[in-house]
Amino acid sequence: GINVYPREVEEVLFKHPNVSDAAVIGIPDEKWGEAIKAYIVTTSSSEGDAEEIRSFCEQEISKIKVPKIIEFINEIPRNAGGKVLKTELRKNHDE
């Protein structure tokens, strides 16, 4: 298997001009065992375009590291210290 580090994918997403915040998690995938899902908060002036963001990512990182699923949300859940609550994101995905 290939190790994909969420931080590496997040750093690419942060370079996109329409992304104001992002978090990446691994989700169960029948074919690969795990797939990449990105939660993205867009800048106030833009709407989310998953295909455009995927194309942007493909120019920066290998295709296997590009998020399979992109979900646009209003806010990334964080604790009082500012750390992303990835357990909350996983719960949201499972629902």
Segments predicted by a language model, with ranges:
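AMP-binding/adenylate-forming catalytic core of the ANL superfamily
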Residues: 1-65, 74-75, 82-92
